[in-house]
């Protein structure tokens, strides 16, 4: 006759994180803590950190996918700040979102103004054949 709480009859399940419940990789608990400590509002609802975490995870995945494509185009296997810069500046929506953001070691987009390019000359042989 044992009177204490034993492990034999215990059917407690392991706790699941809010990130796992929402199907996210980024930490919902950490975002909730940062929202509370950041003095953004007196109270923070339970759905707000889940929503914010999912938005952050989506943005990170989008940028990393485009940067990975830029790295593959340059025949590199490692993403560097230059690839992030190319990915963000070549995407219209990301460029609008991060327009005033400076990426260290990102460089600039290759662009030569049309007036600086040499003028194309018409081929004389082609004009005589059209008549």
Curated annotation (Swiss-Prot):
Phosphorylated to form H2AS128ph (gamma-H2A) in response to DNA double-strand breaks (DSBs) generated by exogenous genotoxic agents and by stalled replication forks. Phosphorylation is dependent on the DNA damage checkpoint kinases MEC1/ATR and TEL1/ATM, spreads on either side of a detected DSB site and may mark the surrounding chromatin for recruitment of proteins required for DNA damage signaling and repair. Gamma-H2A is removed from the DNA prior to the strand invasion-primer extension step of the repair process and subsequently dephosphorylated. One of its GO terms (cellular component) is nucleosome. A motif ([ST]-Q motif) lies at residues 128-129. Its main location: nucleus. One of its GO terms (biological process) is DNA repair. The modification N-acetylserine is found at residue 2. This is Histone H2A.2. It comes from Scheffersomyces stipitis (strain ATCC 58785 / CBS 6054 / NBRC 10063 / NRRL Y-11545) (Yeast).
